[in-house]
């Protein structure tokens, strides 16, 4: 695996040829249909959900596709969580102990909201992708770093985004369920599902 560190600079300007070349022989329709059968499924039984999404699929790529497709079509982005976290982290950027305490408290809130409401921010998306992947025997990592927009603004400081690296058939790929799932309508501050496959399995 590439040497990913906390200070990864993640830009989505990468070529996406690997996705098409490595998986062009796989029809993901079955995986997506299975994911659709579990629409609205609770997160109270993650092993059961992982089994349901993967048990009828043979390849690692298809199993991961079912997981990724389910997460990006069933987990809502929460603008309030994102805004509060960004504001607090900026305020505490020069206070390591205060930032640590905030992170500990906020992380608990994020996971409670994810479990009960299926709403989250990038941390929750990446966590859920990792847990479900590991439950079906796939190696998956969470990567913390910077969103591409912050690179352009030259405002690097505390890492502010999380995504995943997934190992399929011995090869590592990047994916970002947060950006695949949709966007926040800034006129209403409500999340709109709008799946974008560009962030699925990037080399």
Which stretches of residues belong to each language-model region?
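Bacterial Sec-dependent N-terminal signal peptides
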Residues: 1-21
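Residues embedded in well-ordered secondary-structure elements
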Residues: 7, 56, 153-155
């Amino acid at each position: 695996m590439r040497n990913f560190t906390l200070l990864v600079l993640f830009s989505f300007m990468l070529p996406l040829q690997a996705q098409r070349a490595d998986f062009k022989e796989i029809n993901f329709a079955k995986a997506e249909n299975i994911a659709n059968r579990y629409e609205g499924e609770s997160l109270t039984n993650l092993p059961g959900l992982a089994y349901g999404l993967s048990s009828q699929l043979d390849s690692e790529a298809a199993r991961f596709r079912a997981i990724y497709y389910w997460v990006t079509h069933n987990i809502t982005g929460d603008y309030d969580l994102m805004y509060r976290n960004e504001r607090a982290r900026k305020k505490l950027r020069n206070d390591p102990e205060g930032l640590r305490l905030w992170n500990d408290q906020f992380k608990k809130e994020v996971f409670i909201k994810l479990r009960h409401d299926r709403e989250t921010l990038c941390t929750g998306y990446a966590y859920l992708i990792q847990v479900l992947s590991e439950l079906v025997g796939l190696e998956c990592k969470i990567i913390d770093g910077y969103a591409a927009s912050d690179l352009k603004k030259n405002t690097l400081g505390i890492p502010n985004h999380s995504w995943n690296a997934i190992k399929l058939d011995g090869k590592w790929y990047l994916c970002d369920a947060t950006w695949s799932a949709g966007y926040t309508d800034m006129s209403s501050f409500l999340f709109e599902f709008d799946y974008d496959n560009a962030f699925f399995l990037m080399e």
